[in-house]
């Protein structure tokens, strides 16, 4: 249930704005109470940029050890009189928009142990219900990458900074829907009917966001996406791009992806081998695999994770097709396992462990 809220305009008149009510509050004359998070029963006022938030100290402290410690640390003597409507004022050096996103996530928590709709009672033959929804439910399941990054950016940054584990994990889970950390996740994403084609700027934004907030699991596949871009785009110097060190590693990784495609995932085309149970001597002379390899090799960028599906073009027996599928599957699995190493990153497990420290 939402906490009662008052719009600033409904709490004080224009002539009696508490922001400028006393001498000690003159510094807040340019600050504005937030319309959604100036709660009449709030116990602490947080000053973030030019905005004031009157919220519940215990709620924030229960979500974050950092907030708990912050609120219990005595203020310097010169700050002792910084009060507003009986509430202590605490300054936070954060972004106003990021903090609004964080408060939305905290004040609209997920009720994980309850159904979306909880039946409360029956009155006059009508069911009275409450609906429990998380702030994260407000983003569509098929939202594009840019929308997801904008949605999680502030929450991820502040939940990492203030050690709010469950919100950080929700952001990471959303992040991984766009940059999977498992081959199954990649296969599910790649096979979707509404598969999204990422813009290069958004992928670079994702890498920067991941690095800033220690979300290391997303890096291997994000680097994979950058490595497949045209050289001209990678070498462009744009303000919000990834570092030149990361760009250099993506260019090196691009060459390694070519090797992985040739030697691992699609080796069944370049180095065709008959199935052990093959009964047709014609398969040994089939030209289909080599022809398919030349088509693949002419592609502009390597894509060793791509699932090959033109099996009829091989013109070999069913046993040989099954054997090729097995080699292809094992090759893709090996590419995925090696993906971090192709970009000079630690192993998948090491990335996860470092991310969760």
Label each residue range with its predicted role:
Residues 80-84, 93-100:
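Eukaryotic helix-linker segments that join adjacent hydrophobic helices
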Residues 1-62, 66, 97, 101, ...:
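N-terminal BTB/POZ boundary and linker segment
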Residues 2-7, 11, 180-357:
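Acidic, serine/threonine- and proline-rich low-complexity regulatory tracts
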Residues 53-55, 99-107, 117-133, 152-156, ...:
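Short, structured motif recognition centered on aromatic/hydrophobic residues
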Residues 147, 170-171:
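A short alpha-helix capping/helix-loop junction motif
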Residues 72, 76-85, 251-257:
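A low-complexity, Ser/Thr/Gly/Pro-enriched, surface-exposed linker/loop concept
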